[in-house]
């Protein structure tokens, strides 16, 4: 488990261009590198998708948008907890683990805080490269009432690489270069009595791009990976990349209801996202159009967790409860005049109509769980539990875009796809001393596949009984050790996970879909040191994993793609805190080389990836009790490199071959009123 508090997050963001996804990639063992764009596609945890929670509300969707980490204002985050490995207690896609984000809390002494930030590349001083933000927070209590309010604005400029060239937009999954972002959130809590607490929270975040730049399509004529993506000016597109996220969350807590601790939650989420336009005229599944997809989702859910002490069994407790989620998704697309598009060299988009790529899809999940925890003595403890989950996906009959223009179009018959499963978990921990513990665990995870990506690419003869719609069930085995000695703390974990059917893989924009039998084996280790005076500290981590898959109707295994299994990752840092008011951190991250090709042939997610190292320097100084200045230098050695996502080229050509940011400075000033 990795925990980051508010102070650590604020510090690390200044060395990562403000990106939460990049902060986590540098700080969390087992997590792949970030894309440096709007998407967290390919940023797997232990080779599988992670469940992202914001105040307990899932950001994952059945029709996966891979935009969970960019759908919340980073300034509103108070702490992050990452649990690695599949989890039988949570449903909804926790196959690789859980990234749990908590926003700033209500209550306490009345406080107001203003934060102003400024960011610019140091390789090219231009007004369009300048980013800035301002945020305001209010928290406090009034009698039995707690409150919190935060709001802010951010202007996101354009990044520049180590040579001073503008980094091109990412056309496959999108980006938020040249964007405006607004966020507002609030919490109102009421102490009913000493044991009961009721809170309502609302959060709204809107980030929308407004750029004049596109990724030059002329780079496609060169062999993939041989030239960087190039930004060209002249884009004429009214509606660009966008994330709009609304969360409404009602929670109730009771510390002692007939001896039980109760945590209940009801939430509603409304999410809209828009992608970059795409020339899909060679793709029959999308109707052979120049198009732009957007997606609308709303989710209603609830969760109840009850903790019951079983004192008659000694130091024992029972955690039990259930959860419910109902999601509705639809995916329209706009179509553009192909002649105008061609005449402009792929820069001008004139809308001429719209179509439905994926009609309204309803998915529902109902789960119940029970977990028994028991401590035998000071050295031995164990827990075991089970979860039952019942899910379905439902859609009405529809004619897919693959049938557009055909004389006798095929209609996909509507209906329900049902799935249910019993999941189990067990954990045994031995602590020979207070400083050391050894554990072994078994956990199962469960999720529906990406039903939307299957249905929207349906062709002749497709039926809802397809094996592509069977659920993903993951078995995760882990053996680990945690310890501390003198001024050192360390951890070591070895894990192995298997699934008979992995997630649905889409190749060539849905022209080819595949599911494989998967197994992932890996190792994670950390080592940290802090001197007696709490002045000097150092540490690092190592992550290594290997993924193998066996395609359906094949007896041969092959390596999994780089979008699933990252190369060797090493992290290291040195901290120097000479006073209580001055903090300094130098950090470095290394990703190794890995050849993901099969028989030396490039294909989706399969390229010969080169190693890269990046380093950041961050310093934070408290001028007084109320004022703090933080300065971060990202990529301090101004290394020219391609992140993993860019080397794997999501678009399968050079338009996604984006260089990383060059030397960039981010400064922030905060004042408490």
Predicted regions and their residues:
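Flexible loop and strand-edge segments within Gram-negative outer membrane beta-barrel domains
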Residues: 158, 175-181, 195-249, 271-281, ...
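A beta-strand signature from Gram-negative outer-membrane beta-barrel systems
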Residues: 72-113, 672
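Transmembrane beta-barrel wall of Gram-negative outer-membrane proteins
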Residues: 126-157, 161, 165-212, 244-255, ...
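Short acidic/polar hinge/loop motifs at secondary-structure boundaries
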Residues: 57-84, 136
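Membrane-embedded beta-barrel scaffold of Gram-negative outer-membrane proteins
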Residues: 251-253, 261-279, 429-431, 437-443, ...
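Extracytoplasmic beta-strand/coil segments of soluble accessory domains associated
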Residues: 21-58, 78
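C-terminal beta-signal and adjacent terminal beta-strands/loops
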Residues: 446, 495, 590-599, 620-673
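Gram-negative outer-membrane beta-barrel transporters
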Residues: 115, 378, 391, 487-505, ...
């Amino acid at each position: 488990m990795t925990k980051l508090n508010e102070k650590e997050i604020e510090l690390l963001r200044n060395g990562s261009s403000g990106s939460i996804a990049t902060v986590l990639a540098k700080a969390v063992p087992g997590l792949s590198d970030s894309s440096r764009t709007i998407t967290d596609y390919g940023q797997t945890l232990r080779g599988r998708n992670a469940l992202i929670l914001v105040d307990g509300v899932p950001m994952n969707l059945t029709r996966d948008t891979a935009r969970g980490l960019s759908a919340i204002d980073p300034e509103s985050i108070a702490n992050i907890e990452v649990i690695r490995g599949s989890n039988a207690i949570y449903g909804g896609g926790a196959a690789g683990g859980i990234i749990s984000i908590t926003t700033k809390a209500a209550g306490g002494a009345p406080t107001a805080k203003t934060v102003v930030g400024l960011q610019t590349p140091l390789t090219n001083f231009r007004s369009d490269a300048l980013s800035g933000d301002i945020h305001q927070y209010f928290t406090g209590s009034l009698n039995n009432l707690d409150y919190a309010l935060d709001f802010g604005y951010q202007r996101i400029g354009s990044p520049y690489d180590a040579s001073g060239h503008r980094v091109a937009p990412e056309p496959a999954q999108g980006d938020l270069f040249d964007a405006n972002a607004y966020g507002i959130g609030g919490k109102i809590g009421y102490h009913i009595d000493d044991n009961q607490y009721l809170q309502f929270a609302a959060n709204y975040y809107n980030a929308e791009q407004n750029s004049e730049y596109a990724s030059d399509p002329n780079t496609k004529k060169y062999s993939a990976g041989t030239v960087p993506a190039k930004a060209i000016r002249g884009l004429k597109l009214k509606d660009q990349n966008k994330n709009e996220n609304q969360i409404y969350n009602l929670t109730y807590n009771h510390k002692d209801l007939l001896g039980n601790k109760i945590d209940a939650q009801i939430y509603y989420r409304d999410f809209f996202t828009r992608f970059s336009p795409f020339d899909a005229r060679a793709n029959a599944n999308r109707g052979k159009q120049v198009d732009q997809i957007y997606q609308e989702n709303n989710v209603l859910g609830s969760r109840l967790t009850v903790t019951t002490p079983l004192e008659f069994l000694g130091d024992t407790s029972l955690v039990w409860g259930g959860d419910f989620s109902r999601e509705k998704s639809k995916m329209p697309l706009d179509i553009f005049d192909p002649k105008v598009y061609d005449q402009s060299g792929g820069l001008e988009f004139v809308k001429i109509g719209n179509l439905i790529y994926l009609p309204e899809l309803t998915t529902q999940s109902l789960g119940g769980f029970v977990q028994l925890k028991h401590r035998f003595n000071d050295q031995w403890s164990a827990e075991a539990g089970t979860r039952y989950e019942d899910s379905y996906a439902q859609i009405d009959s529809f004619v897919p875009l693959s049938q557009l223009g055909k004389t006798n179009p095929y209609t996909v018959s509507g209906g329900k796809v049902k799935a249910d499963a019993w999941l189990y978990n067990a954990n045994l921990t031995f602590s020979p001393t207070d400083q050391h513990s050894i554990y072994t665990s078994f956990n199962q995870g469960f999720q529906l596949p990406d039903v939307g990506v299957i249905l929207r690419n349906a062709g002749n003869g497709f039926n809802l009984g397809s094996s592509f719609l069977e659920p993903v069930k993951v078995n995760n085995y882990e053996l680990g050790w945690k310890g501390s000695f003198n001024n050192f703390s360390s951890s070591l974990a070895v894990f192995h996970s298997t699934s008979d059917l992995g997630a649905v893989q889409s190749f060539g924009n849905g022209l080819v879909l595949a599911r494989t039998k998967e197994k992932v084996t890996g190792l994670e280790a950390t080592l940290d040191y802090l001197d007696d005076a709490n002045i000097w500290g150092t540490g690092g981590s190592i992550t290594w994993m290997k993924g193998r898959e066996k395609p359906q109707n094949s007896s041969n295994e092959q390596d999994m793609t780089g979008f699933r299994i990252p190369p060797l990752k090493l992290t290291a840092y040195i901290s120097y805190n000479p006073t209580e008011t001055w903090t300094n951190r130098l950090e470095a991250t290394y990703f190794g080389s890995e050849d993901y090709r099969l028989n030396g042939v490039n294909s989706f997610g399969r390229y010969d990836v080169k190693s890269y190292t990046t380093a950041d320097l961050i310093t934070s100084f408290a001028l007084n009790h109320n004022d703090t200045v933080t300065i971060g230098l990202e990529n301090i050695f101004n290394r020219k490199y391609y992140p993993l996502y860019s080397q794997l080229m999501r678009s399968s050509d050079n338009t996604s071959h984006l260089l990383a940011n060059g030397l960039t400075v981010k400064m922030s000033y905060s004042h408490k009123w």
